[in-house]
Every structure is written in structure tokens, then in C-alpha cells.
Amino acid sequence: MNLLNLFNPLQTAGMEEEFDAIKIGIASPETIRSWSYGEVKKPETINYRTFKPERDGLFCAKIFGPVKDYECLCGKYKRLKFKGVTCEKCGVEVTLSKVRRERMGHIELAAPVAHIWFLKSLPSRLGMVLNMTLRDIERVLYFEAFVVTDPGMTPLQRRQLLTEDDYYNKLDEYGDDFDAKMGAEGIRELLRTLDVAGEIEILRQELESTGSDTKIKKIAKRLKVLEAFHRSGMKLEWMIMDVLPVLPPDLRPLVPLDGGRFATSDLNDLYRRVINRNNRLKRLLELHAPDIIVRNEKRMLQEAVDSLLDNGRRGKAMTGANKRPLKSLADMIKGKGGRFRQNLLGKRVDYSGRSVITVGPYLRLHQCGLPKKMALELFKPFIFHKLEKQGLASTVKAAKKLVEQEVPEVWDILEEVIREHPIMLNRAPTLHRLGIQAFEPILIEGKAIQLHPLVCAAFNADFDGDQMAVHVPLSLEAQMEARTLMLASNNVLSPANGEPIIVPSQDIVLGLYYMTRDRINAKGEGSLFADVKEVHRAYHTKQVELGTKITVRLREWVKNEAGEFEPVVNRYETTVGRALLSEILPKGLPFEYVNKALKKKEISKLINASFRLCGLRDTVIFADHLMYTGFGFAAKGGISIAVDDMEIPKEKAALLAEANAEVKEIEDQYRQGLVTNGERYNKVVDIWGRAGDKIAKAMMDNLSKQKVIDRDGNEVDQESFNSIYMMADSGARGSAAQIKQLSGMRGLMAKPDGSIIETPITSNFREGLTVLQYFIATHGARKGLADTALKTANSGYLTRRLVDVTQDLVVVEDDCGTSDGFVMKAVVQGGDVIEALRDRILGRVTASDVVDPSSGETLVEAGTLLTEKLVDMIDQSGVDEVKVRTPITCKTRHGLCAHCYGRDLARGKLVNAGEAVGVIAAQSIGEPGTQLTMRTFHIGGAASRAAAASQVEAKSNGTARFSSQMRYVANNKGELVVIGRSCEVVIHDDIGRERERHKVPYGAILLVQDGMAIKAGQTLATWDPHTRPMITEHAGMVKFENMEEGVTVAKQTDDVTGLSALVVIDGKRRSSSASKLLRPTVKLLDENGVEICIPGTSTPVSMAFPVGAVITVREGQEIGKGDVLARIPQASSKTRDITGGLPRVAELFEARVPKDAGMLAEITGTVSFGKETKGKQRLIITDVDGVAYETLISKEKQILVHDGQVVNRGETIVDGAVDPHDILRLQGIEALARYIVQEVQEVYRLQGVKISDKHIEVIIRQMLRRVNIADAGETGFITGEQVERGDMMAANEKALEEGKEPARYENILLGITKASLSTDSFISAASFQETTRVLTEAAIMGKQDELRGLKENVIVGRLIPAGTGLTYHRSRHQQWQGVEQETAETQVTDE
């Protein structure tokens, strides 16, 4: 044993301790001294002539250990035989020099010093404990004031501050009856004399007696800190330091450069400063120097220690010779370049290389081409081993030589070594897990790595100079995992949405499309063939062409009852190309999948179907064959682009003239004052938008058809073989929007701020642009480039926050047994089913039985995983909604259960235990982030036009139903006018399933009745898109109030038109203060001149005009129900700025309160209005029991309810963006989840990105993981504190078992950054953001990190508790428990 120890001196008993948790705390002076190997007394570092460390200095060999292995400083003892001897001459212990990396020293401070983290890291912990303000504590610490530490019998207060003059006056007055101190001594005295237990008692009593919210918060915070100290057994005065530990010298090296200069770590400067000041202070104290000098020196010492610990936290940062702030201990660990992110979470690895990538079109899916040079270097150890084994080399040195000479045997051995040894390829940025995949290397000449074209989509790689890194898995386990889990051919489906990610693109698509298109009257049309071989012969002898329509007998394979394949022969009418393609179909895939022109979407469906029907292996082989075929026919097709392919439609000139005429007409109307400037702009933009679309349509119609003569000599249309059209139509490259710019018109352009320039570019690229048009276009083009550069960083940051909040979420058990879940319905918007029910529930587990609505029988039992078969069955039976399990309601404590998560999207079956679903969710949401531009102009263009819809039409036949919020009145023309704010017309089909849902704005005229049968294309409602009306619900005679011209309303005369109208003036703009509160209103009188009241109440009808309203009625005018009183131009009330794209997603996940948030009803009840205050309206809701809830709303806000309306809790009452916190509070978790999922999906859908809902739900689960204790009961929590949901549940269960009162709690929603920082693991939080704050808090709380999450385990250098690491962690825990039980048993037997 001792012999072994000789060679392994560092692995003594203490080093290899198994540990299960890491605890952080504040070190006591004794602890610091116990770490130390000696006191550093001098600021010297090394002797500049001998380069030997000075004795007692910062690099002293006596304290920190020898500079050279097994050699003392003076050279008396050398070599291993003297190991452990301490030299009597120089005092150095003979041992390994690497102890200089771990031996610490210490500095005995002549005066105590406060630790800056506990002082300045907000909120100040010292301030909290002492209940003093930070300002006061600083005045004491930096010697500006005295603090009374012991008032004795005097009337002074403990902790009272005295200025110097005060102090001397009081001394004269009271003599030695009281104690007051300055500096850290004073603070330390206060801390030492504070009775923690007593203080806690007092605070708990105060907490119960006090009523004010702010006070409760303040006391609770103090209580938390004091209880933490009490619990952990740390003393308060340890926050003040007597002893300063010194970092081991090799961690702050000093390296001699040539020319007698030294490169040194900043820490040495900072330590030197501390030692100098400390020694000076010692000397001054010995000399009994005057007080003022000593004080100054103590203050300087405090400042020196401050900047050593955290430079720049207080006052100016200390700078070195180069005027840069010195890098202190705190800077070493925080930020991107700090210890956590640079060295612990991101290490560089050996056995890796990188090179440019190029295409390997002949590779199989699981292969990649690896340059021989790289392979030789990467696989060196394996080659050395083989050379020695085969006896070609006797030592490693000899083997090295052989490899360097590159003798022929080495290449043979390399081939052997590489066979079946997977390597991993990675392309930065690795945005999701498919950014690293394993391949089998094929040795190639040249220096570029060859990559299979089909995996490019997963890596987001192209061959314009991208580079990739290669890593070699060394151990057998690593090779096994690479092969089974990471091999490219095992990753066919995308983890984000479960669709194939190995989908052909570009040339391959074009080749397959060209091959499967049909041509009218091609050579040999109508021939019949006995089998595909005959078709081959005919094609090769040029009897038929690729597109020739023929009839052929094909053999297909169908599964019989026993599950075996049987051949079936069918006749098909098809084309030559499709018949040839049928040869590569896997067994069991029907021919009809390829019996059509294959576009990109179709090919994706084809591969998906193949995966579901034929399994992984056949699909991979099929994908490879598709690729080879596609490339082959793309080459044979020779499709190219010429300028003539961009055909400009003949109708263009006429369409442009028509649009110009319309614009001219609008301009005329504007001159006559019929429309406002804003309306004119909206309409002009609208006209040009429509004109652009019409031209595009004419152009596409023109491009997509060509006239040909068929066999009978008639002229017929067939789909065009225009190259540009084929590329766009197949989905290979380009889109209709791009072709529109090539040969239609470029259309409207956006300014950099997103607003649209109203003069469009009428030319296209083929005609060429004028200088002005070119100039207009540069705006948008440059913004695009600037955006791209900026948005990448934002996207990366979002992904980082998401990963951090979900990193510890792992599937840990099979089933948590809950029956909770969410009800899923199809997403219907406008007339379209955006996401069908089947897509939303596929791969979920049912939470309750699914029942057939017509027969009432159970279709699917609760707890069943819904496969494709089952969802199709549910779909056909007409079920409208299904309750499914969801991660948000999962009851598993630390992690998730497989049933609540459902199907693992990338594997197509129930998720395995150990799958890191949190990280996968974060990557799936973050990865497309780069594609979500900051509010792109596509949206800029679309938003302006969507606003101009003026009617809704039904898209399908069915029955119209009005939503529950629908309110309308009939006007005197008999039209139904909508007066509700959130009304919808829903259309149900014959079985009663919801097919469409249309929003109808306030003031729209309904053209259908509730329950009426309607036909597709029927108009449901119409309205004026450019103004918002104000409508009366009662009939009567108009009587104005507060209608003073020039005070509340202004007669506006349009400069251009000379017509005038009354417009309500903004209250802020009015001259006198009295008139600011006046609001122009309209009352209604009956024929006797009495004010009309709201039916059933005695409140008179009174409608206030909002600011900017143009009043359309006159005093004394008779009006009927549903008449328009005023119109509010839409241009002035701009449509709310829609935050789009990435910022919107970030806003949702950060749970930010939107500015100008809308308001939701707090309770269910009846609305009434109370007395108005200055600038605010008072809205009162009274519930059934007569309890009133009132709230003040500023007058600018648009109130959506009116007197006497009944509202439900959580219904919107004031217009504005919804605050997610309100939804959670008033409508509960399910409504909140539905809102966030819906809103996030909206953003991704606009970009055409598909993400499974469950990923968003996983993030929401983490945002809801903490709860607020409303009433602690007898659980030991503090009322008002936030705790982990799991801890709270556990505490409540325990309380109930013991018959105590459980805690009541309320759900709270945390943004992802907040949630990451509030995790139980301080290591994970500290490595994310705000390192200083997290560590300070953790140290005071004496926190223990259980190392449950992935990040903590990466940091301490363990396998992560996910995937194959989960079993490792579980077996470790079992071993531990076994050991613990054994020790317990032995103790029992001993007794």
C-alpha cells in the first residue's frame, strides 16, 4: 500500500472522497487558518536575479511547496528518496511541485475588514442583519462616523451613528458609560452581540401583529437571512474578516519574459497592495501613531481588500500600469470568460480536428469522408497499439517514428483501426442536438471532410466554405453510444416536431420532380408494359421519354395477417419516370405515394410514410436511393435559367393603369375632405398591395401553363416546363414571391422602421429599376443585412436562457398516476383550421376516456398513448376535444414522468426514462430562433393589408352560431349591428364540430342569424375597416353635454378640402385646468324631453366620446338603436405595434407585463360606473352577494364593457395586451398555458416553423415551478416567501401526516431568467447570470447543492443524470444506501 502511495502521492484518502452534494458557507477565521500552510508576511514575489521565490513572500517555497519536483529550494535534498523531508536550511518540504496549485497561505490582518460581497451585493446582507441602511454602514466602515455598540446606561441608542464631534461631546458628557467604535471593529461588535434566536422570535411576533404589506415584506426578508444563519450555525461576525486567505501561487502565476520583464496575474498586484498596507498599519499601531493616521491606514486596508475580492464594486476600480482595471477574484469566476463558463462548462478536448466540408454525393447516410491526414493524427494511439501488437514496433517511440515516416503498413493499420469506429462531426453553432452526429469514416484523399447531402438540413450546413469539427469517441462505451444513439442513420426524425429531418432538397428535389412530371403527347404515349424491366428497355432505346404517359404492371408488397409480405400485381396508369422510381420503393410502401409529381412536401410525406410503415432501416436505405436517383436525373434533365424564362404578363400595363386610377380617385376624395390623410395612406397602400397580388397572379397563371397539341391534334393547356416555374413549383429553390420580383412587379417597400412607402416599385428585375426605384429598394435590403447580424446574438441568448431554465428536467419515472390534463381542441382562426385536433393530440397520453359523441361508446381508454391509427379513428368519429396529459400537470417531484410527456418525437415511441426533455424543448424552441427576423417586412407588408379586411365569408357549409359574448341591436333599417367587443361567429358542420371561427369587430353589420344554415362563400358580416364607429344601443333625441367649441371639441377644417367637422380635443392639450376634466358626452331624451335611463336601472344613458372622435350627429337629432354617433379614424388610433418574431417569444417566456396592459375582471358580477376622479374613471363590479370590487382606470383607456353588463371573472374589461400574470391569477394554469402556447406558436407559424406544443409546455412547467406561500400554516415556511412547488407539496404531505395545518399557496409565474436564478442549485444559478449575487446569497443561506441537474454535474465533472448517465447515478445512490444500511446495522450489533 505504501509503495503505491509513493507513486501516487496526491490520491491520499482525502482526495478521492465520494460526495453527493456540495455545501457552501462562510468560512470562519479558524477554518481559513486551518487551510493555510503559513503566513505571507512580505509583498516580495521572486528575486529578479535568481528567479527564486523570496522567503515569506507571495511565492514563498516554505509556505507553498517546492518549485521543482522533489527538490528543496537550496538544493540540499534532491530526488524521490527524500520524499517528505523538510529541509532544515530553507524550510521547504521535499515533494511534488504541483502542491503549489493547492496549498494556500494566509495574511493576518492588523484590523478587521468587512467582506465587500456581504456589504455591497444588493440587497446588502449586512444591512439586512443589522437593520441599518447601506449608507450608514458604509459611513462606519470607511471611518466617517462612529457607531454606538453598547449604550450602557446612557440615553443613546444601540446602532446610533455619531459624527466625530458628536462622539467627543458625548464622551465629555457620559465618560466611559458607553461604547462607540469606528470601522469594521464597530460593525463586528454589533454583529457579535446580536442575539439571533431572540431577534427571530421578535420578528415572528411582529410579522403576526403587523398589517402593512411593505412591512411584512421587509420583516420576511430579514427573517429569512437570520433563520438561515441560525440554521447553518454560521456566526454573523464571520462576514467581517480577520484573516485573509491567499490563493496558491500557481493559480496566480508570475512568468519571466525575455528582457528582464515579468508577466504576472493581476491578483499578485492586489495581494501586494493588501500586504503593504497591512504591514504599514502594523507598524503604525506599534508606534502608537495619531488616531487620524491609523484610521486612514485602516480605511486604505479595507479598500485594498475590497478590490482584491471584487474590484470596482465600490468606488473607482484599482488600475494596473496599463490603466486597465485589475482583474479581481470575483472577475475570475463571472461572465463568459470566467471560471464557470470558460473552463467548467466549455472545455477544449483532445482527439479533435476541423476542416472545410464538401459534398459526398456517393456516401451512404451513415458515412462521411475523412481526409487520410486527419485520420492518421486522430487515431494515433490506436495505430501505436496495433503497431506494437503486430510486432512492427517495440516501443511507443519506435511506433511514433513509423507513423511519422508514413510507411505503407501504417496506412493498412489505419484502415483496420478505422473500420466500424464511429467519429462525431459537429458544426458550430450547435443549435440543437442534431448539430453533433456520428458517422463511420471513409478514408479519402484531399484535405476536406466529405458530408452526406441529406444531413445538411440537420447541421444547417452548406458547402460555401463551412467548416466542421471531428471528435473521436475513445472508450468502448463512448463508441457504443455514438453508434446506437448518435449515428446519422438513427436520427431521421426531428426532435422539434417528429417529422423527418432527412428530406431531400434543391437539386435532388428538382431531379425527382422532373422525373415524375407528365408530358402531354410525348413519344410513345399510351404504350402498355408488362413490367418495369420492359419500361427500362424502352426508355434506354429512346422509344419513350421520361414524361410519357403509359400503363404498366407493377408488383407491390402487402402485409398479410401473419405480418409477412406477399406480392400483389396491379396495373397502373403512370409515367415512365414514376415507373422507374417505383424500383427503389421499400417493401410495404404503396406505389400511389410516388404516382404523382413529387414536390418537396410530397417527398417529405413519402419519407414520413416510409418511416411509419417500413421502419427505420428501410427508410434510410430508401432516402439514400432517392438521393442518388434525384442527383442522376437532375444532371440528365439539364434544367437551367435564361432571361427569357422570366415571362412578363401582358396584362401588367392594364393592371397598373387601373391601380393608378384608383389611387387618383382616393387622392381626389382626400382633397374633397371625404377621407382623412391616414385613411388615404391606408387605402393607397391597400390598392397597391392588391395590384401587386393581381399582377403576380397573372404572371403565375401565365408561367404555369403552356399550350400543346395533344394526340388528337387539339390545342390543350398543360403544366409548364418553364425552368423557373419548375424550380419554384417543386420547392427546390425560389418562391412565388421571388418570381414576382423577377417578372411581375417588385411591389411595396418598407422603410427601415417597418413602415411602408406608399409609392411601390412598379418595375421588375427583368425590366430593370429606375434610379429612384433602386434607391427606395436599398432601404429594405440594407435593413435585412443589419438585422441578420443583430438577431443571431439575440437568438443565441434566448436559447441559453431556455436551456438554463429547463436543464434539470429529465424523465425519471414511467407514470406519476395523475388524471389531470388539459383539454385539447383544434386551433381555428378565421375560416381556417390552423392545426387540426389530430395533430395536437398525436403522441400524447389520454387523461380521461375518449367517448364517441354519437354512440357514447368509449373509443380510447384513459392512459393510452395516441398513435397515428388512434388519432385517425378519433378524427373520423367527430370528437371535438380530448383531455390529454401534459408536462404542466405532472406530479413527479424532481423531473417528469413518461406518460405526462408522451411520445419521444425523435424516436416515435413513448419517451424513455433518462431523456433530457428539458434541454430538447429549449433547443427546439431556440433553434429556429435565428429564422425569426425582427419583425420582417414580410410581416410589415402583411400587417398593413390584414388591417383592411372589411368582411368575413364562410369557407364551408354548416350552421352559424354566435359566441357567448355576442351582443347586437337591430337598427331602424333592420340590420343587426354588433355592440360587443369580443364577438365571434362560429360555424359548425353537420356533426356539430367547430369548423371555423370568425372575429367580428364592434360596429359590424351581421348578415346571418344565430342557428342559421349557411353555404360556403356566404358573407357573414361587413364593416368599414378604416374607422371605428361609436354606436348607440338606445333610441331617443340627442342632447350634448360639455360640448364647448374650442374647449372640449374643435371644429376641424381640412386644409385641402375646406370641410369642417367636430373633433374631440385631447384633455392634456386643453388650456384651463378646469376644462381638462370635462368630457364631451351625449345623453338621450324621450319625446317629453326626459333623460332616457338604462332599462331596469335609474341611471341615465350617457355616452362619452373618446379623444379624436369625429362626431356625426347634431344636437336635437332623432336617432334609433344601432345608429352611429361618431367615428374614430383608425389612422389616428394606430393599430397597436405588434412585437413580432423573436422579441415576442422572449417577451412571453420572460412573462413581462406588457405596457398598456388590458384589464381583466377580478370577479364575476355586474358592471357599474362610480364617481370619476381626476383623469380616472371608477369601474365597479358587484357580484351576486352584493360584494363590490372597484378599480380606477385612466380615461385614455378604452373600456370594453358598459353599465349593467354581466362579466365573468377573467373576462377582458379594458382594451389592451393581456398580462399573463392576470390570466394565471384569474383563470388558472390551464388558461395561462393555452395563452402562452397559442401566442408562441403564432410567431413560429408565421415563419412556417413547426414546433410541438409539448416543448412550450415543458418551459411553462419550469416557469410555474415556484409558489408563493399565502399562509404558512404549521409547515415552517414564512408567509410570503417563494418556494419550489415540490418542496411545498412534500411539506404539506408531511404536515397532513402529522395532523398539522398545511400551507396555503398561490401559483406564480416567473420569467425564464428569474426562474433559472431561483433554482435550488446554486452552482447552476451562479454559472448562468449574476454570479456574485447568487453565491453571496447561497453562502449566507448555507445552501447545499444536491447535484440533481445536468449543469451542476458537468461542472463537478461527472456524468450527467440523463440518458445512460441516469443508470450510473441510480446505481451510485443504491450503493450509498447499501453502505449506509450496513453501517447502521454494524452499529446496532456493536451495541
From Swiss-Prot:
Cofactors required: Mg(2+); Zn(2+)
EC number: 2.7.7.6
Stated name of the protein: DNA-directed RNA polymerase subunit beta'
Top-level class of the enzyme under EC nomenclature: transferase
CDD domains membership: RNAP_beta'_C, RNAP_beta'_N
Annotated function: DNA-dependent RNA polymerase catalyzes the transcription of DNA into RNA using the four ribonucleoside triphosphates as substrates.
Amino-acid positions noted as binding Zn(2+) 1 in the UniProt annotation, renumbered to this chain: 72, 74, 87, 90
Alphabetical list of InterPro entries matching this protein: DNA-dir_RpoC_beta_prime, DNA-dir_RpoC_beta_prime_bact, RNA_pol_asu, RNA_pol_N, RNA_pol_Rpb1_1, RNA_pol_Rpb1_3, RNA_pol_Rpb1_3_sf, RNA_pol_Rpb1_4
SUPFAM superfamilies reported in the protein's UniProt record: beta and beta-prime subunits of DNA dependent RNA-polymerase
GO MF entries: DNA binding; DNA-directed RNA polymerase activity; magnesium ion binding; zinc ion binding
NCBIfam families in the record: rpoC_TIGR
